[in-house]
Amino acid sequence: MPLPIARSAIRRVSVHSSAFTLGCAGMRMISTPSKKKQDGGHTQPKAAASSLAHDATTAVRSLVPPPQPLRIVPPTPEEEAHMFESTVASVEQWLASPRFAQIHRPYTARDIVSKRGSMPVQPPASSLMADKLYALLERNATNRTAISTLGAIDPVQQSQMARQQDVVYVSGWACSSVLTTCDNEVGPDLADYPYTTVPNQVERLFKAQLHHDRKHWDERCHMSADQRATTPWVDYLRPIIADADTGHGGLSSVFRLAKLFAEQGAAAIHMEDQLHGGKKCGHQAGKVLVSTGEHINRLVTARFAWDILGSSNILIARTDSESAKLISTNIDVRDHEFIKGAYNLPPGTKSLSETLAEKEAQGVHGAELDNVEREWMDGVMLVTFNEAVANHNASNPSLLEEYDRRVEGGVSNAEARRIASEIFGEKGVPAWDWHAPRTKEGYFHFKGGLSAAIKRTKAFAPYSELLWLETKTPDLVRAQGFAAKIHEDFPGKWLVYNLSPSFNWSAHGFSDNDLRTFISDLGLSGFVLQLISLAGIHSTALITHELSKAFKEDGMLAYVKLIQRKERESGTDMLTHQRWSGAQYMDRVLQTVSSGTSSTSSMGADSTEHTF
């Protein structure tokens, strides 16, 4: 017996089932004869030749079935069980698709379906954009090339990038400095703004993309075939990659944030392994890491949020461990080999935190208290346990080789002590204390560097599509070495590189040709996504600085020389800013719904834009 459902006419249309052509009168479907169906001999429409239906030019769609009509009466227990099991089966098929072949999930399809509710899943538009991004990444990985892009801070920049850049990047640093949510308080990149800030910027840019796409489509619908053939197509639907910082809190915050990003239009997000509340820009000092396991939990949580939505958004795992010097906890044994402690601390020495607390109680504050901390740190030898073992047993190189072999890859500190005792005897175990030098906030000291970054990145690899090492210098050889190490265990894994404006590129010995080929050279090593995160910030600052300075001296001559003439020469559509904004599109909308509006048309004969 069919299930009782609301009466509604439902038509399922595949984007590959037919082709469309544009004409001045609008849209027209083309159908051509095809092979007859076996059941009755009726002819089926055949898709006309079209690049839109070609696998090489379109993204593979998410394997989410179309929604079913809602019920008007409750299901029986049997129907309810059938609904659940059939949905589980479809989700299992989705998870087993090639799209997720390299993604590990520590949960099941049943876990996903049980959290969805009874409303049929309809993935957000960002899922389509994610599919497009995935196809772009695949193509570049195959060709050993890279997607390179610039950070955009507003719809103007985004629209101008659309002609050359395949993707758009939204930086948390930029949002913190130019667009924050709620209180509009701008400041440095500490991720202390409301967690809706970057998603709101994404929504702003995504809606602008849709607007310019509609405007562009409408213009082409009113062109002749010859005009369309000579007018370049502009793809405004560029996947947006956004900065999710640390996830902005605990796992419930990560869950909400990932969901919000998907709903607001982000095709991909990146999350870094810094501590929320202690986060710094990747090129600043004072960074505090979370445990390896905590960041993995963040990645898993974001994926679970998207799976509930039925969305195939892309996750980028970033590590800041190359230059980090602190870690929030020693709970994860995978981090133990990089945690530093005080070696051969004199008996009776008070810990750093205890020393600082005593001095504060005595009224010592500010710079004087900083000096107390500096003196304490200068008076101890701060090393990892393995370094302490090597120093303590320097006279036994052969035994040290055995020790290094047995702790290779990392073991817990307790296990490392046991191994040292077994090899060197009790006296060979150094006096080493990782609690004594803990900071006032309780953080442990951490030995950052490439080894730590490689280990962490490999731990994050099964949970994300791309991996990002935040580097402290633009070093091509170092980046290539990092890529080689990652690809030993994860062949072909996609990598990200930040072409950061925080680097003084002119001070690193690059020739002009080195700079010209830097991106393509990195692309050969698997860095398929490369971005100048703050390009929008710097380009806006530069042109505004130059224009303001010249305008003060030369008045309108400065504007015409620096802006209007260059707009005309470069071919930017911003020269005619009314048309760029969509005024002509809106006129057509109003003329469609209300006749006799030509006299009030914003782009009528009196518009000054006709002088261009």
Model-derived regions: residue spans:
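Extended, intrinsically disordered, low-complexity segments
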Residues: 70-73, 77-80, 84-87, 91, ...
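A short pocket-lining beta-strand/turn micro-motif at the edge of beta-sheets
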Residues: 30, 493, 528-531
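Short secondary-structure junctions
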Residues: 143-144
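Short beta-strand elements of ligand-binding domains
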Residues: 496-498
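Alpha/beta enzyme core
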Residues: 105-106, 113-115, 131-140, 149-494, ...
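Active-site beta-alpha connecting loops in nucleotide-dependent enzymes
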Residues: 508
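A broad, structure-centric signal for solvent-exposed, well-ordered loop/edge residues
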Residues: 8, 12, 107, 177, ...
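N-terminal mitochondrial targeting presequence
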Residues: 1-73
